[in-house]
């Protein structure tokens, strides 16, 4: 299948019971059709920097699958971006979007442009040039990109403005927009809140209450902050957060207001946290997974939780891990946690709250409505609870009860394949 990435091979292996149970899939070449994008776009992005020099970056949009709805997936702006990374992320996005139960297909895009160190004018120049080409291939009912690494509210705003200027229409062609021009309430909180809604449901099904439990969270960005906030609202105690230089241990529970001020207002390092909570400890480097906790929520970055970390969590009596970041747990660590009976919620399910709320933003845009925070949050909670029950049911149907990684892959896969089968060979 020409899938060089180990995670894609793992997914195909986990879906083998489904394929064996449906010989018609092989006859229709479902896998061969699924792993090839419907469309791959690659284009130059010329723009002028503040010194009057013309710069050229490369832009990408991989429109992977529209079997269940318009292509949906973020735009990543980072020097590491290449076609291989975008294709892999787009492939994963198909199944994450499918799990939400909402009518959204899978796609991904981006550029090797680095917004760090660039002026606002340079970022605007790049975004306008990028959208000048991309606008030919996207639309509210065709392909709806969103933010990702390097693409925040500023970049989305510049891209939306250029799309509107060229196409002459005001439509929900991007999500993650500002509230003043079609964005959704609760979008900022969605991934972190959704993580806790799914984690709570996973624990509940296994006879465990979230309230009263001790939680380790890694990261201190958007997902980590709102995961911490929601965990403490639900009665748990979060005792750690981290950033790229070190981590904080607060035995009394992380002060979310202090964390927000440090990270969202001051944009400072966690070394300042001790100024707010004198009884807390700051440690340089890694080590957040060495703390004895009941639940671990990796919310920082890809491949942050290694095999040795998994061994430490098991030794310390941790009994649940749910991924808040995209693929933060290595394959070896995931397998070790599962073999040792740890409840493990994979990111394609547990951090799907962000894309789910993006789809809710699309719904509001199409209806020309703006829902209240409580309305969006209530819909998000229902979506996350349903995601968990769908993956749990899928795992049970194929004799893999408790294997939520396999359950998530199967549940996402089945919906897409059913749609592909119904629509014929297209």
Task: Describe the predicted segments one by one.
Residues 10, 14-42:
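Short, Gly/Pro- and small/polar-rich lid/capping loops
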Residues 246-344, 349:
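Rossmann-like adenosine-cofactor binding region
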Residues 78, 97-211:
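Glycine/serine-rich phosphate-binding loop and adjoining beta1-alpha1 elements at the start
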Residues 1-13:
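Single conserved hydrophobic/aromatic residue that forms the stacking wall/gate
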Residues 32-115:
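Glycine-rich, N-terminal phosphate-binding loop and its surrounding beta-alpha-beta segment
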Residues 6, 202, 314-426:
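Adenosine-phosphate binding glycine-rich loop
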Residues 175-178, 183-292:
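Glycine-rich phosphate/diphosphate-binding loop of Rossmann-like nucleotide-binding domains
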């Amino acid at each position: 299948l020409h899938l060089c990435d180990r995670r894609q091979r793992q997914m195909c292996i986990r879906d083998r019971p489904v394929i064996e149970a449906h010989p018609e899939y092989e006859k229709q070449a479902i896998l061969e059709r699924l792993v090839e994008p419907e469309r791959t776009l690659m284009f130059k992005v010329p723009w002028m920097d503040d010194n009057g020099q013309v710069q050229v970056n490369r832009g990408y949009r991989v429109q992977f699958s529209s079997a269940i709805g318009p292509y949906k997936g973020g735009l990543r702006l980072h020097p590491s971006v290449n076609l291989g990374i975008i294709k892999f992320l787009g492939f994963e996005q198909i199944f994450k979007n499918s799990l939400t139960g909402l009518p959204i297909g899978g796609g991904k895009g981006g550029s090797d442009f680095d917004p760090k160190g660039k002026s606002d004018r340079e970022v605007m120049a790049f975004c306008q040039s990028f959208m000048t080409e991309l606008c030919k291939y996207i639309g509210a009912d065709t392909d709806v990109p969103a933010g990702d690494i390097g693409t925040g509210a500023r970049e989305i705003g510049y891209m939306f403005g250029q799309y509107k200027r060229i196409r002459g229409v005001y439509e929900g062609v991007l999500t993650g927009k500002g509230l003043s021009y079609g964005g959704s309430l609760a979008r900022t909180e969605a991934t972190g809140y959704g993580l806790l809604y799914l984690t709570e449901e996973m624990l509940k099904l296994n006879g465990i209450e979230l309230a009263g439990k001790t939680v380790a969270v890694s990261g201190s960005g958007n997902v980590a902050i709102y995961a911490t906030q929601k965990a403490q609202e639900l009665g748990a105690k979060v005792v750690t957060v981290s950033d790229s230089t070190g981590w904080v241990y607060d035995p009394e529970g992380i002060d979310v207001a202090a964390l927000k001020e440090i990270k969202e207002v001051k944009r400072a390092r966690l070394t300042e946290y001790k100024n707010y909570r004198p009884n807390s400890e700051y440690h340089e480097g890694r080590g957040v997974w060495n703390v004895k906790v009941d639940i671990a929520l990796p919310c920082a970055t890809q491949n942050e939780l290694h095999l040795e970390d998994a061994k430490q969590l098991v030794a310390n009596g941790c009994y649940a891990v749910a991924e808040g970041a995209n693929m933060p747990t290595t394959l070896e660590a995931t397998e070790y946690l599962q073999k040792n009976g740890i409840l493990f919620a994979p990111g394609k399910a547990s951090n799907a709250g962000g894309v789910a709320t993006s789809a809710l933003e699309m719904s509001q845009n199409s209806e020309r409505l703006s829902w209240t925070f409580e309305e969006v949050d209530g819909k998000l909670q229902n979506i996350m609870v349903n995601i968990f029950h769908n993956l749990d049911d899928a795992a049970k149907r194929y004799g893999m009860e408790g294997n939520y990684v396999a359950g998530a892959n199967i549940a996402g896969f089945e919906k897409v394949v059913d749609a592909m089968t119904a629509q014929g060979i297209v």
